[in-house]
Swiss-Prot record:
Its EC number is 2.3.2.5. It catalyses: N-terminal L-glutaminyl-[peptide] = N-terminal 5-oxo-L-prolyl-[peptide] + NH4(+). Zn(2+) binds at residues 160, 203, 331. InterPro entries: M28_QC, Peptidase_M28, QC/QCL. This is Glutaminyl-peptide cyclotransferase. One of its GO terms (cellular component) is extracellular region. The keyword Zinc applies.
């Protein structure tokens, strides 16, 4: 009997071990399947708009409407915690919430220590289809650098970064009908949508340092890293859902050049170059020549400290659209409306809008 009992125990143990192995393998396979979507960004291919569609984009965007309705209300002093910061935040949210595309707007407010004590910061996150697994993300900062008033003048940071904010608002307006169609998800379309982020507290209050800079982006990157995505997921978070972070900064002066900073996103930089060339050849860019292209192939630029850094360190692919060299008016009182170049901004609006439509297959 003893021998029979031993065999039964051994047989039972063998069965339990086999079941545990099967369950483990099944769970592992489910985990792999559930995480497979995070790799789709690596082989995502854009659509290519034809000449007629490119013409429609050029006709659909309006530099005068952007200037009057989006940009001018932002050309104010708006350092974190200031009355202007509140006004800028309300302006951005109101311009987005009036659109048909049904953006979901979230304000991420938090306190952080600064050289002047604790300050309140508020990031603005505007998302189409938050339930989508993947998002193309456009971002900029809406705060202006704090400078003491000098001879009754204030620093309004036109290129830094009122213009990028206005460009993103104009993109949302000009593409409103097409972006609204992202609601119509079908099996033939990728589970992909668009997110706009307006960071607070990019600028240092005193001297740039790891502690005194990038307040909003540091906070949001950490928050997204600890937020499961899709909701309830155990192995993936909101950063996994970021296909590509396109960060706009120091835009608005004449004749900017944008280097390619990151080998990992070279194919997307190349796409911007191709769109620029296509629009130019169709006569849809103003005051522009290919002898002085915006998107230049002169090697990988030195990494510039900006709001993409906290996300880059956590593995998010980045396309950094910052003028390099910086505009001559950078961090001076002359970074104002008078020194902006409307044709350049209009041209870049067209290029970026085409890029977004192609990425999202719209």
């Amino acid at each position: 009997m003893a021998g029979s009992e031993d065999k039964r125990v051994v047989g039972t143990l063998h069965l339990l071990l086999l079941q545990a192995t099967v369950l483990s393998l099944t769970a592992g396979n489910l985990s792999l399947v559930s995480a497979a979507w995070t790799q789709e960004k690596n082989h995502h291919q854009p659509a290519h708009l034809n000449s007629s569609s490119l013409q429609q984009v050029a006709e659909g965007t309006s530099i005068s409407e952007m200037w009057q309705n989006d940009l001018r209300p932002l050309l104010i002093e708006r350092y974190p915690g200031s009355p202007g910061s509140y006004s800028a935040r309300q302006h951005i949210m109101q311009r987005i919430q009036r659109l048909q595309a049904e953006w979901v707007v979230e304000v991420d407010t938090f306190l952080s220590r600064t050289p002047y004590g604790y300050r309140s910061f508020s990031n603005i996150i505007s998302t189409l289809n938050p339930e989508a697994k993947r998002h193309l993300v456009l971002a900029c900062h809406y705060d202006s650098k704090y400078f003491p008033r000098w001879d009754s003048r204030v620093f309004v940071g036109a290129t830094d970064s009122a213009v990028p904010c206005a460009m993103m608002l104009e993109l949302a307006r000009a593409l409103d009908k097409k972006l609204h169609s992202l609601k119509d998800v079908s099996g033939s379309k990728p589970d992909l949508s668009l997110r706009l982020i307006f960071f607070d507290g990019e600028e240092a209050f005193h001297h740039w340092s790891p502690q005194d800079s990038l307040y909003g982006s540091r906070h949001l990157a950490q928050k997204m890293a600890s937020s499961p995505h899709p909701p309830g997921s155990r192995g993936t978070n909101q950063l996994d859902g970021m296909d590509l972070l396109v960060l706009l900064d120091l835009i608005g002066a004449a004749n900017p050049t944008f280097p390619n900073f990151f080998p990992k996103t070279t194919r997307w930089f190349n796409r911007l170059q191709a769109i620029e060339k296509e629009l130019y050849e169709l006569g849809l860019l103003k005051d522009h020549s290919l002898e002085r292209k915006y998107f230049q192939n002169f090697g990988y630029g030195n990494i510039i400290q900006d709001d993409h850094i906290p996300f880059l360190r956590k593995g998010v692919p980045v396309l950094h659209l910052i003028a390099s060299p910086f505009p001559e008016v950078w961090h001076t009182m002359d970074d104002n409306e008078e020194n902006l170049h409307a044709s350049t901004i209009d041209n870049l609006n067209k290029i970026i809008q085409v890029f977004v439509l192609e990425y999202l297959h719209l």
